[in-house]
Amino acid sequence: MENEFQDGKTEVIEAWYMDDSEEDQRLPHHREPKEFIHVDKLTELGVISWRLNPDNWENCENLKRIREARGYSYVDICDVCPEKLPNYETKIKSFFEEHLHTDEEIRYCLEGSGYFDVRDQNDQWIRIALKKGGMIVLPAGMYHRFTLDTDNYIKAMRLFVGDPVWTPYNRPHDHLPARKEFLAKLLKSEGENQAVEGF
């Protein structure tokens, strides 16, 4: 199922290596020259993504199939913008602190856009631009952070397996089982890729 719904996915999900600038976090932060990353690289890191139809999400069969297959039993919708999110400044700061969760983080962009930053296997930041229609799953145990872009607005569906628990563990929390399991999967994936390349 992870490979379904790929048509036009790069129009709603784009990724690149970030520079080290301390400028406004809402800027793209491209390196010079720009280093874009294919979605397959994100998949290797454990990040799953789809392109869906956000204008009819209530009746979207593909969304229903994903939810059933992955056990996403709870959803809610949140607007992240200064006008609609209570304690906006505090929340945005906490979202941008590097952290992990012991469960997947699943977000489906219904309107607007934003950035998820994730670490690659060499601890380099990759910026993932999520636009309207993009759905992304960050694996449990992956260090990441979130920020709006300069448009300052995203309307996102949050999906959960069971109760809606969003507990961030700010880095470092390498002792957590979710982190150890994530790293083990990453090493296994790297080993398999090297074996194929060496064949």
Swiss-Prot record:
Induction: By low levels of ethylene and submergence.
Pathway terms, separated by semicolons: Amino-acid biosynthesis; L-methionine biosynthesis via salvage pathway; L-methionine from S-methyl-5-thio-alpha-D-ribose 1-phosphate: step 5/6
CDD domains membership: cupin_ARD
Cofactor comment: Binds either 1 Fe or Ni cation per monomer. Iron-binding promotes an acireductone dioxygenase reaction producing 2-keto-4-methylthiobutyrate, while nickel-binding promotes an acireductone dioxygenase reaction producing 3-(methylsulfanyl)propanoate.
Gene3D superfamilies for this protein: Jelly Rolls
Amino acids binding Fe(2+): H99, H101, E105, H144
Keywords: Amino-acid biosynthesis, Cytoplasm, Dioxygenase, Iron, Metal-binding, Methionine biosynthesis, Nickel, Nucleus, Oxidoreductase
GO molecular function: acireductone dioxygenase (Ni2+-requiring) activity; acireductone dioxygenase [iron(II)-requiring] activity; iron ion binding; nickel cation binding
Catalytic activity: 1,2-dihydroxy-5-(methylsulfanyl)pent-1-en-3-one + O2 = 4-methylsulfanyl-2-oxobutanoate + formate + 2 H(+); 1,2-dihydroxy-5-(methylsulfanyl)pent-1-en-3-one + O2 = 3-(methylsulfanyl)propanoate + CO + formate + 2 H(+)
Enzyme Commission no: 1.13.11.54, 1.13.11.53
Annotated compartments: Cytoplasm; Nucleus
GO terms under cellular component: cytoplasm; nucleus
InterPro entries: ARD, ARD_euk, RmlC-like_jellyroll, RmlC_Cupin_sf
Entries under Pfam families matching the protein: ARD
Binding site for Ni(2+): H99, H101, E105, H144
Cofactor(s) it depends on: Fe(2+); Ni(2+)
Keyword Nucleotidyltransferase annotated: no
Any one Gene Ontology BP term: L-methionine salvage from methylthioadenosine
Known function: Catalyzes 2 different reactions between oxygen and the acireductone 1,2-dihydroxy-3-keto-5-methylthiopentene (DHK-MTPene) depending upon the metal bound in the active site. Fe-containing acireductone dioxygenase (Fe-ARD) produces formate and 2-keto-4-methylthiobutyrate (KMTB), the alpha-ketoacid precursor of methionine in the methionine recycle pathway. Ni-containing acireductone dioxygenase (Ni-ARD) produces methylthiopropionate, carbon monoxide and formate, and does not lie on the methionine recycle pathway.
Family stated for the protein in its record: Belongs to the acireductone dioxygenase (ARD) family.
Record's protein name: Acireductone dioxygenase 1
Native source species: Oryza sativa subsp. indica (Rice)
